[in-house]
């Protein structure tokens, strides 16, 4: 929105030309995202406490989690509002990719909100029935997938980029729709599974978003895209503003979510944030890099799949508890140690993912 205003004012006041620079808007997106979250946070927390919207703790979980019962949840609302407002302020709203990401934010945020509402307010421990949750996730993801496939104007928008191999970029064709669906829904649920400790999900989300901010900038810059042998996608650079909004809003949320947490993000936050990372990876054609940089999310998801599969097939559990962060808690690791070590792993994986852009 401010881009339009600045373009109108620039002929009269040249100072406003700075708003047209992507890097300036990306930095401002971080700052406003952070500012919105810090402003919304205390007000939202007080409101959640007033309405007695508190976390329900599993009886079979680690004993250290019993003290978390009643902590305000659905704090993801502050993250999504902060991202949305920052994007509306600083992104070029004429860019279709901006609206695709905002659609994902709103649709998956709504699914998560309904799930939290049923759990916390309606006192239904199962929340939104699993099949209906996956149905609406699938519906939203498929709408996006079909839209992107139908509106693709260049081959670069539907190729599969394979890390380490600069000459292997097969055209996906209709498989693009299927892959987009799995990436969005998979990422959404992976972040949701990771959100089990104070700050555990949000900081890896911030780090991965930072990595994709750089990738989006390079993908939308024809010179850097050619230099790195990655597809040039004309509209992709604007995604940098969205990624930096995630960084700012995420850090603002972490201010209240750090151990011991004053608020939890709930499904309204985790489902939406995962889906946003998924759609950004699709738009910049770096789905495999999401798999690498979001390795902690993958590890958490695989631990659940392996645990359930092993129990059904052999009647035995592999881990003391899944997702795997609970396994380490039950081994005696203090919660902050689990959190920080998972953060360190994510930092290493994000750097590794960025390095793969050059090692081709």
UniProtKB/Swiss-Prot annotation:
It holds the Pfam family MraY_sig1. It is an enzyme of class 2 (transferase). PROSITE patterns: MRAY_1, MRAY_2. InterPro entries: Glycosyl_transferase_4 (IPR000715), PNAcMuramoyl-5peptid_Trfase (IPR003524), PNAcMuramoyl-5peptid_Trfase_CS (IPR018480). It comes from the Bacteria. The chain crosses the membrane at residues 21-41, 71-91, 94-114, 142-162, 168-188, 199-219, 236-256, 263-283, 288-308, 338-358. One of its GO terms (cellular component) is plasma membrane. It is a multi-pass membrane protein. PANTHER family: PHOSPHO-N-ACETYLMURAMOYL-PENTAPEPTIDE-TRANSFERASE, PHOSPHO-N-ACETYLMURAMOYL-PENTAPEPTIDE-TRANSFERASE HOMOLOG. This is Phospho-N-acetylmuramoyl-pentapeptide-transferase. The gene is mraY.
């Amino acid at each position: 929105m401010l881009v339009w205003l600045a373009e109108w004012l620039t002929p009269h006041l040249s100072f406003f030309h700075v708003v047209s620079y992507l890097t300036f808007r990306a930095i401002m997106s971080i700052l406003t995202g952070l500012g919105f979250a810090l402003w919304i946070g205390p007000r939202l927390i007080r409101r959640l406490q007033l309405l007695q919207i508190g976390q329900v703790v599993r009886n079979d979980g680690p004993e250290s989690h019993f003290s978390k019962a009643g902590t305000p949840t659905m704090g993801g609302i502050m993250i999504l509002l902060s991202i949305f407002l920052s994007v509306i302020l600083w992104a070029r709203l004429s860019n279709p990719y901006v609206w695709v990401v905002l659609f994902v934010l709103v649709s998956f945020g709504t699914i998560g909100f309904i799930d939290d509402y049923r759990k916390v307010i309606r006192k239904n421990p199962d929340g939104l029935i699993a099949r209906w949750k996956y149905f609406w996730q699938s519906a939203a993801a498929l709408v996006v997938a079909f839209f992107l496939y139908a509106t693709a104007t260049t081959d670069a928008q539907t190729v599969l980029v394979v890390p380490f191999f600069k000459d292997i970029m097969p055209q996906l064709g209709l498989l693009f729709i299927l892959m987009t669906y799995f990436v969005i829904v998979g990422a959404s649920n992976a972040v949701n599974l990771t959100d089990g400790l104070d700050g555990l999900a949000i900081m890896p989300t911030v780090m991965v978003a930072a990595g994709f901010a750089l990738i989006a900038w390079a993908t939308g810059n024809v010179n850097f895209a050619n230099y790195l042998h990655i597809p040039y996608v004309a509209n992709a650079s604007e995604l940098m503003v969205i990624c930096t909004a995630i960084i700012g809003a995420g850090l603002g949320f972490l201010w209240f979510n750090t151990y011991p947490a004053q608020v939890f993000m709930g499904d309204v936050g985790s489902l939406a944030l995962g889906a946003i990372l998924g759609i950004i990876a699709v738009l910049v054609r770096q789905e495999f890099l999401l798999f690498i940089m979001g390795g902690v999310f993958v590890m958490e998801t695989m631990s659940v799949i392996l645990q359930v599969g092993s129990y059904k097939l052999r009647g035995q559990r592999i881990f003391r508890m899944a997702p795997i962060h609970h396994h380490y808690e039950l081994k005696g690791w203090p919660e902050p140690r689990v959190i920080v070590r998972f953060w360190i792993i994510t930092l290493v994986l994000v750097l590794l993912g960025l390095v793969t852009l050059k090692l081709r």
